[in-house]
């Protein structure tokens, strides 16, 4: 089949195998649209059967779904194949095509390179000797003509076979593949922290002196990609700049208030409920979930709050699923909201992959101790290098973070489509954030305004 050199024929095939779209896929789509990239999501609506890639080799299902997609494409066009959950495109067709033609004048398939020979380290000696540390094939992103890619994978593999091993052997045993050694097109980010900075809304690799087009947070580097995301699409707002601090929705979608309280401290409960009542939002239903079980308090509280449950130690989502509400608004008793139009502001931010949003609040006595973590290590708190800038409002915006607490707005699609009740830490807020991370549902902290405080 004749090759097409028309720029309009470039197609990005994003591998996004999932029954429901994750935030990783939604983010990928948003960036494709922003950079005028034609794209197709491969494996959309299908169950993942490719193994647990966090702990073992696997991923062969990606090859099989790609084969199905290629069979539906008749033109021999240039195609970028890439992951979606942990990958962001940062430029458009013109730069992609220019770099591809520079990397391979004879139109081979170009694969991403990385630092490690995974999953079979015994292949190291079979790789060519090159003068760079980015010397091993990474299968998370590659580019070539449709017919060449199809010929490479036409026999398929088992769903649990390893896709990276499959392509690594193809690279070693044939002359059909070249690697992007200088990270011109593709950047596999695992253990490359010291090489990478964000410059002019792009990742810059100081080791290769390049601006990669596709940023891939492979393996544990997903955290690094999510951390950098806040600097890609737009520049964060300088802390000294004025921000919009009053908001009003034209129409109020129904919000489910899930209030998690402890009636053993009645004075604190009264203060909390008083502030909740001052939130300016009409279309709502309120449920109280009390960790204590005091008969006297129960009778008193139920007079004003008929949707009241006691002895609750975990976050509850079943009541929401039975409702017709469009948003789940989680509030802990020690979080005091002072910004009365907070829901109008937060709901306006819920779009694309921003489905879980938490306004930043700090403690009265220590405002730099807040309700978010900028980083985690083994699931627990780790301070990110930009944490204090965010906590002190030196820069403002929406920030992809691994943990939020106490004030969280979630779109109904998150609560209805995903299991948010996984247990790993026996701590309800840590377990909720763990569940969201496992499903590639992003948590965004917003610090554009002052929203309240913790006690």
UniProtKB/Swiss-Prot annotation:
The molecular function terms of the Gene Ontology recorded here are: procollagen-lysine 5-dioxygenase activity
Source organism's superkingdom?
Answer: Viruses
Stored Pfam families: GT_PLOD
Q: What is this protein called?
A: Uncharacterized protein R699
Instruction: Please name the source species.
Output: Acanthamoeba polyphaga mimivirus
Tell me the organism's taxonomic lineage. Answer: Viruses, Varidnaviria, Bamfordvirae, Nucleocytoviricota, Megaviricetes
């Amino acid at each position: 089949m004749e090759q097409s050199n028309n720029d309009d024929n470039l197609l990005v095939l994003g591998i996004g195998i999932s029954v429901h779209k994750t935030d990783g896929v939604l983010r990928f789509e948003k960036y494709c649209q922003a950079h005028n990239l034609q794209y197709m999501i491969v494996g959309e609506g299908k169950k993942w059967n490719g193994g647990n890639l966090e702990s073992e080799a696997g991923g062969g299902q990606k090859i099989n779904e790609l084969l199905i997609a290629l069979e539906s494409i008749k033109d021999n066009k240039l195609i970028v194949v890439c992951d979606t959950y942990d990958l962001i495109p940062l430029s458009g067709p013109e730069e992609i095509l220019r770099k591809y033609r520079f990397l391979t004048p004879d139109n081979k398939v170009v694969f991403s390179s990385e630092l490690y020979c995974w999953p079979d380290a015994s292949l190291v000696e079979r790789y060519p000797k090159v003068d760079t540390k980015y010397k091993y094939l990474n299968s998370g992103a590659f580019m070539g003509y449709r017919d060449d890619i199809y010929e490479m994978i036409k026999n398929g593999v088992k769903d649990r076979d390893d896709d990276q091993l499959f392509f690594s052997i193809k690279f070693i045993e044939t002359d059909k593949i070249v690697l992007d050694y200088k990270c011109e097109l593709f950047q596999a980010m695992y253990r490359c922290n010291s090489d990478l900075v964000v410059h002019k809304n792009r990742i810059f690799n100081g080791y290769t002196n390049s601006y990669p087009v596709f940023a891939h947070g492979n393996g544990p580097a997903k955290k690094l990609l999510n951390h950098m995301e806040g600097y890609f699409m737009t520049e964060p707002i300088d802390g000294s700049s004025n921000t919009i601090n009053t908001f009003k929705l034209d129409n109020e979608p129904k919000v489910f208030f899930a209030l998690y309280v402890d009636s053993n401290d009645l004075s604190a409960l009264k203060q909390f409920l008083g502030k909740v009542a001052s939130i300016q939002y009409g279309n709502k239903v309120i449920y109280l979930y009390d960790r204590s079980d005091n008969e006297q308090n129960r009778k008193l509280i139920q007079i004003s709050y008929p949707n009241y449950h006691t002895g609750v130690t975990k976050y509850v989502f079943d009541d929401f699923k039975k409702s017709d509400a469009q948003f789940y608004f989680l509030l802990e008793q020690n979080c005091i909201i002072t910004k009365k139009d907070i829901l109008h502001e937060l709901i306006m931010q819920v779009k694309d992959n921003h489905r879980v949003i938490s306004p930043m609040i700090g403690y009265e006595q220590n405002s730099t101790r807040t309700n978010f973590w900028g980083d985690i290590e083994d699931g627990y708190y780790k301070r990110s290098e930009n944490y204090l800038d965010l906590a002190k409002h030196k820069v403002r915006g929406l920030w992809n973070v691994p943990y939020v607490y106490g004030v969280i707005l979630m779109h109904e699609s998150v609560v209805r489509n995903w299991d948010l009740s996984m247990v790993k830490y026996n701590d309800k807020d840590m377990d909720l954030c763990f569940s969201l991370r496992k499903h590639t549902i992003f948590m965004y902290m917003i610090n554009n305004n002052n929203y309240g405080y913790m006690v």
